[in-house]
């Protein structure tokens, strides 16, 4: 929640490739001076599909989607903010459903004298309550992330770096079929193993109401680019715009030559619409 705002609401829409879309609604309430509560609802729709029988004959339609409801609590102590989210996640494919109970925990440190922020998060700690088949349960997508952002003094730039999947040192995937990656080296270099954990970002602060952003995801580029036409896979760009109390965020992320995804977010402080009347003025 942006500083100085007490009842913040935000809506996000992501236009992925094909018919896949992701919607998120978030509401954050400042309970006391140093704490806040948050409620979130997320819906990821994968589209509609044609169902076929064993002989390949059409047998109707089905859809697939993921849902998640989250409750978050955050508390600020001096220069540290600690928080945790409890999430109920449901995944549905046709008549099959899986349910999981998850939690995210993390902390943020803000330097008292510099524009420096460091964050650590443990995401998707939990247990699958119900599997698609009702038999063996799948592990949750656990992820440990460490992030840092820094704005040098007197410079209109902010730099950020995020390390993900720290619980798994080697996340390099090599295609050994000899078809899709005919010219790919089957040797793993230490530099590549480290780089695939990192996401780099830069932000040009043109004013308090307009920022331009650029990002690079090395893992995404290495896994999704075409060898003969890598293009802009792994790169992203966007902007932040503030207009009359509303904050608009837009980003375009390039995954593959086949297309890119668009991310839209609009947020505002509801308190500005329900300001209490000053008794002295009546």
Regions found by a protein language model. Name each.
Residues 1-282:
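Subset of outer-membrane beta-barrel
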């Amino acid at each position: 929640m942006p500083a100085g705002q007490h009842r913040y609401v935000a809506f996000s829409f992501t236009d992925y490739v094909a018919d896949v879309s992701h919607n998120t609604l978030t509401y954050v309430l400042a309970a006391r001076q140093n704490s806040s509560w948050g409620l979130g609802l997320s819906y990821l729709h994968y589209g509609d599909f044609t169902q076929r029988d064993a002989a390949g004959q059409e047998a109707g339609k089905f859809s697939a989607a993921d849902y998640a409801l989250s409750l978050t609590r955050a508390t600020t102590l001096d220069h540290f903010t600690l928080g945790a989210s409890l999430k109920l996640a449901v995944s549905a494919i046709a008549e099959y459903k899986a349910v999981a109970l998850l939690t995210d925990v993390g902390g943020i440190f803000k330097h008292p004298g510099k524009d420096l922020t460091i964050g650590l998060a443990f995401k998707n700690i939990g247990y699958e309550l119900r599997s698609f088949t009702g038999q063996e349960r799948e592990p949750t997508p656990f992820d440990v992330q460490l992030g840092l952002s820094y704005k040098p003094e007197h410079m209109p730039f902010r730099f950020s770096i995020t390390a993900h999947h720290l619980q798994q040192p080697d996340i390099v995937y090599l295609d050994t079929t000899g078809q899709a990656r005919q010219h790919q080296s089957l040797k793993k270099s230490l530099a590549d193993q480290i780089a695939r954990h990192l996401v780099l970002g830069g932000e040009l602060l043109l004013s308090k109401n307009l920022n331009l952003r650029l990002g690079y995801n090395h893992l995404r580029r290495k896994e999704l680019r075409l060898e003969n036409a890598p293009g802009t896979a792994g790169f992203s760009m966007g902007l932040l715009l503030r207009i009359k109390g509303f904050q608009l965020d837009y980003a375009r992320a390039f995954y593959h030559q086949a297309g890119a995804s668009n991310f839209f977010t609009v947020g505002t402080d509801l308190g500005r619409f329900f300001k209490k009347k000053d008794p002295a003025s009546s």
